Amino acid sequence: STLSVSAGTGTFLDEGNFETISFPKSAVPDRADFGVRVCGDSMEPVYHDGQIAWIQECSELSPGEVGIFMYDGDGYIKMYDEQEPREADRYDFTDSDGTLHMQSVLISYNKKYEPKLVSPLVRFSIVGRVLN
């Protein structure tokens, strides 16, 4: 099945919004669980509007990996990174044990798009790793 994810400002991604497309087995990476259609230009020149990105489901990524994310109800394809939160935001990134957590950052390859700093106050999840 294919779902659209934004390579831009965000696209709704849910399990009820899909189509089935046939591909030769050789076109699909072995570990792919599903494919999503890229929508937009923020990941150019690597990922293009309309291209299928093949996804391995996972809930964690390392900085520098490209993934599919749900953030505030929208789906994104971006490069994952982490940074120490700004001083003003540290309270929101500190758990009840006093441990300071890193802030997730979603980065576009196309430099006309600013990095998206993930707020701990908004729903965020890693859906999977892009394999192609």
What positions do the PLM features span?
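Extended boundary segments
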Residues: S1-S22
